[in-house]
Structure formats: structure tokens, C-alpha cells
Regions:
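Extended accessory and catalytic-adjacent subdomains in large enzymes
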Residues: 1-156, 163
């Protein structure tokens, strides 16, 4: 599924949302009355707009993965395991900072696992090359196009899946 949101204010709000049902995001006044907006309302709105069961967390996951990918693409290819680990932390930190999360939370819950695995296995470097030569479209940036291609090849391995 894919949807496009071009409203910058909505994108900013979605990126600030937490997956805590009913978490109050902000209040506003209209005609002298106070109205509250909570995360459930934002998630309902996203569902209504898209027609799919998306939530703010889906957008945060997409954003974190995109930031992680783009951050790593700017770095030179690592020559050692130590450099690879340092680069991974850099990419995770960039995504965590953008989302306002810790490194551990971002890695565990927001960055798509295939990105980290692919970087560790040096597979991601071929996608960095595609990213540099892929043209943007009206619907997707070049990094988003490449990420979708990578995700299409992703398979969940039940033997290594983490329990909830």
C-alpha cells in the first residue's frame, strides 16, 4: 500500500506522535472552546484518509528507515568491522534524533530490520548506488523508491523472529 501526504503540518504532527492510545498531542481553541487532539484521533484520521489501517507509527517507521538509509549512503564504505559498527551507530543516531527517541528504541522499533541486516552483510551498498542514480517521481523520492525495492525482497524468518 502507498499513500502520499503533502501537507507539511500533518507530516510534522504525525512524526511527533507516539503509539500511546489517547496520548494528548495538543489543544486548540475555536470560538472560545478548548478542543483536544490525541494520538487516537490522528490515527483515526490517517485511517480515514488512506483507507488502510495505517497509524502514526507506520509513518515514524518509514521516516526512521529513510533517514537511516540516507545517512549511511553519505558515508564511505567501511573497510573494517569497527568502521561498519561505527557507521551503523551513526545512522541509528540520525534516525533517533529525528524521531526524538533513544538509539535502542529506534533500532528495535523503528528502523526496518532488513536495512541493518543488509548493511552488516554489505548488500546495502548496491542500493546506495541505485539511490544515487534513481530519479524522483511525484509520489516517491529516489531513496523511497530504492527502499521499496529492497523491502519487496524482504522475508520474515520465523526462526529468528523476536517474540512480542
Amino acid at each position: 500500500h502507498s499513500i502520499t501526504i503533502r501537507n507539511k503540518r500533518l507530516i510534522k504532527l504525525v512524526n511527533q506522535c507516539e503509539e500511546i492510545p489517547g496520548w494528548e498531542l495538543f489543544n486548540y481553541f475555536e470560538k472560545g472552546e478548548k478542543h483536544r487532539i490525541d494520538s487516537s484521533m490522528v490515527n483515526d484520521y490517517i485511517h480515514q484518509l488512506s483507507g488502510y489501517n495505517f497509524s502514526a507509527k507506520d509513518f515514524r517507521t518509514w521516516a526512521a528507515s529513510k533517514i537511516f538509509f540516507e545517512s549511511l549512503s553519505e558515508l564511505p564504505a567501511p573497510k573494517t568491522t569497527k568502521e561498519k559498527d561505527k557507521n551503523l551507530l551513526y545512522g541509528i543516531d540520525q534516525a533517533a534524533q529525528a524521531l526524538g527517541n533513544t538509539r535502542n528504541v529506534c533500532r528495535a522499533y523503528y528502523i526496518h530490520p532488513t536495512l541493518i541486516e543488509s548493511y552488516e552483510d554489505t548488500i546495502l551498498s548496491q542500493y546506495f548506488e541505485k539511490y544515487k542514480t534513481t530519479e524522483e517521481s511525484t509520489d516517491f523520492t529516489s531513496s523511497e523508491k530504492v527502499l521499496l525495492e529492497l523491502y519487496a525482497k524482504y522475508e520474515i524468518r520465523l526462526d529468528s523472529a523476536k517474540p512480542f
